[in-house]
C-alpha cells in the first residue's frame, strides 16, 4: 500500500550490437522506448541508433515516444499505475526508480549486465544508482556535474573577469550585484518546474554540511531540520533578496530559462551538463554565438563541505518489467564504446559513462565537467531523484517556498524533515 501511495506522489515529482537477443528471426518483437529529447537534432540521434539496430535485427521494431520532460513524468506515472511500463524509459536512477522496482514494474537486468558490460562503466557510482541490493534495472548513458554556466561577454560588460569567475559565495554575490548594476539579469531560472531551484538549496547544503550532514539525516541519525539545512535556506534567501532573476521567475519554465540564456538576456544558469545541448536545441544559430564559461558552485567559507564535492547526475534508461531480451540487448547497444563516443560529439552533448569513450570529449567545458565528476570526493545525486518520492516532493515544495519568500529557512527545513521522518526507515 505504501508503494502505491508513493507512485501517486510521483505525479507531483517526476518538480557494439550485443548478443543477448534470443527470439528467432521469424518472431517479431516490438520495443517501446520513451525519451524526453524533443529538439529535432537530438531526437534524430536516437532515431538513427534505433534505425541502425533495426537494420541489424529485422525482427525488431522500435517504437519511440518523445515527450516533454514534465509531460513524460506525468504520463509515466499513469502507465505505471496501470501496470503497463514502457520497455525502455528515461530514468535518473535513485529513489524514484527504486520505488518502481519495489512495485514490480522494472526488469532486473543484473544477469545480462554482469561481466564485460558492467566492467565497461567508469561512472561506477552512477551505475549503482540504477540498482539496489544486487539487482539492476537500467544503466546511465551520460553522467556529469551541475555547475554554473556563464556568459563571458556579459561578464565583461559588467566589469567582471570572465577567466577568473567567483570561487566563494561572497564573491559570487558580488558578481550578481555587479551584473545588476550593469543592467544585466544575473541568473536564469525557470522555477515553475521547481527542480531547477532545488539545485541551489541542495548545493548550499552540500557546501555547508558536507556528506556527513546528508548521510546523518538520510540514515535517521540526524535531521533535515539540522543547522546545515536551515543555513542552506538562509544563504538561498540571501541570494533571493538581491532579486537576481527575471521578473516573474516563479512562473517561468525551464524552457524559458534556456531562452534567456540563448538570447543573452541572463548571465548565468545553475544547470547540468546537458545545458549546452539544450541551448542548441532551443536555437542552434544563437547558441553557436554564445561565449560560455563554466564554474563549480562556489564554496562557503567555514563550511564543512569540500569545494570539490559535486551535485550531479545524468540520464539513463530503465527496463520495464515486461520487456523482452531484445530491449536489454538494445540498451547494451546504446552504451557500447562506439555509441558512447558518438553521443559525446552529437547534438546530445553527453558525458560518457563508459571509460573507453571518455577521450571522445573535446569540448573544454565538457572536459571540466568530466574532471569534476571523476575527481569529486563526494558525489550527490539530485535530491528529487535520490530521495523517496514523498520526501523529494517535500524538498521541491520547501525550496519553492524559499524562493517565493513564503517560508522561513527553519520552516522549509521542518517541511522536509516531516516527510523524511514519515518515509525514511
Model-identified regions with their sequence ranges:
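Conserved C-terminal helix/tail region of periplasmic/extracytoplasmic solute-binding proteins
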Residues: 30, 61, 156-157, 162, ...
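A structural signal for short loop-to-beta-strand junctions that line the ligand-binding cleft
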Residues: 86-87, 117-155, 185-186, 304-310, ...
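Short, solvent-exposed loop/beta-turn-alpha elements that line the ligand-binding surface or hinge
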Residues: 107-124, 165, 191, 208-231, ...
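Conserved N-terminal structural module of periplasmic/extracytoplasmic solute-binding proteins
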Residues: 5, 20-103, 115-118, 162, ...
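Extracytoplasmic/periplasmic solute-binding protein
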Residues: 133, 137-141, 146, 171-221, ...
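Extracytoplasmic/periplasmic substrate-recognition and gating elements
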Residues: 51, 55-56, 82, 158, ...
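Hinge/lid segment of periplasmic solute-binding proteins
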Residues: 92-150, 173-174, 200, 228, ...
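Glycine-centered hinge/linker elements that transmit conformational signals in sensory
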Residues: 174-178, 218-250
Amino acid at each position: 500500500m505504501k508503494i502505491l501511495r508513493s507512485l501517486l506522489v510521483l505525479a507531483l515529482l517526476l518538480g557494439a550490437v550485443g548478443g543477448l537477443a534470443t527470439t528467432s528471426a521469424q518472431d517479431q518483437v516490438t520495443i517501446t522506448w520513451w525519451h524526453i529529447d524533443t529538439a529535432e537534432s537530438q531526437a534524430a540521434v536516437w532515431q538513427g541508433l534505433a534505425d541502425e539496430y533495426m537494420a541489424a535485427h529485422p525482427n525488431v521494431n522500435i517504437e519511440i515516444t518523445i515527450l516533454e520532460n514534465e509531460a513524460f513524468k506525468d504520463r509515466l506515472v499513469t502507465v505505471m499505475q496501470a501496470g503497463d511500463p514502457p520497455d525502455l524509459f528515461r530514468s535518473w536512477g535513485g529513489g524514484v526508480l527504486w520505488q518502481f522496482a519495489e512495485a514490480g514494474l522494472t526488469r532486473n537486468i543484473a544477469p545480462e549486465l554482469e561481466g564485460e558490460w558492467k566492467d565497461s562503466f567508469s561512472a561506477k557510482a552512477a551505475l549503482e544508482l540504477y540498482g539496489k541490493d544486487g539487482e539492476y534495472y537500467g544503466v546511465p548513458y551520460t553522467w556529469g556535474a551541475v555547475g554554473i554556466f556563464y556568459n563571458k561577454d556579459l561578464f565583461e560588460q559588467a566589469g567582471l573577469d570572465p577567466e577568473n569567475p567567483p570561487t566563494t559565495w561572497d564573491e559570487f554575490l558580488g558578481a550578481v550585484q555587479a551584473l545588476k548594476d550593469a543592467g544585466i539579469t544575473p541568473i536564469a531560472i525557470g522555477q515553475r518546474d521547481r527542480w531547477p531551484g532545488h539545485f541551489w538549496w541542495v548545493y548550499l547544503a552540500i557546501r555547508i554540511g558536507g556528506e556527513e550532514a546528508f548521510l546523518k539525516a538520510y540514515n535517521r541519525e540526524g535531521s533535515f531540520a539540522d543547522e546545515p539545512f536551515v543555513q542552506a535556506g538562509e544563504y538561498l534567501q540571501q541570494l533571493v533578496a538581491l532579486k537576481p532573476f527575471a521578473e516573474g521567475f516563479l512562473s517561468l519554465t525551464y524552457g524559458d530559462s534556456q531562452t534567456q540564456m540563448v538570447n543573452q538576456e541572463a548571465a548565468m544558469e545553475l544547470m547540468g551538463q546537458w545545458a549546452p545541448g539544450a541551448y542548441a536545441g532551443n536555437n542552434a544559430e544563437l547558441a553557436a554565438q554564445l561565449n560560455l564559461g563554466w564554474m563549480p558552485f562556489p564554496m562557503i567559507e567555514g563550511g564543512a563541505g569540500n569545494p570539490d564535492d559535486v551535485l550531479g547526475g545524468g540520464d539513463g534508461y530503465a527496463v520495464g518489467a515486461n520487456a523482452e531480451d531484445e530491449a536489454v540487448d538494445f540498451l547494451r547497444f546504446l552504451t557500447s564504446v562506439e555509441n558512447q563516443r558518438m553521443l559525446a560529439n552529437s547534438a546530445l552533448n553527453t558525458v560518457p559513462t563508459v571509460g573507453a569513450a571518455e577521450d571522445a570529449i573535446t569540448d573544454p567545458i565538457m572536459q571540466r565537467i568530466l574532471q569534476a565528476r571523476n575527481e569529486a570526493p563526494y558525489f550527490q545525486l539530485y535530491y528529487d531523484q535520490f530521495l523517496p518520492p514523498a520526501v523529494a516532493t517535500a524538498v521541491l515544495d520547501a525550496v519553492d517556498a524559499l524562493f517565493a519568500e513564503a517560508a522561513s529557512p527553519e520552516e522549509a527545513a521542518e517541511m522536509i524533515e516531516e516527510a523524511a521522518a514519515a518515509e525514511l526507515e
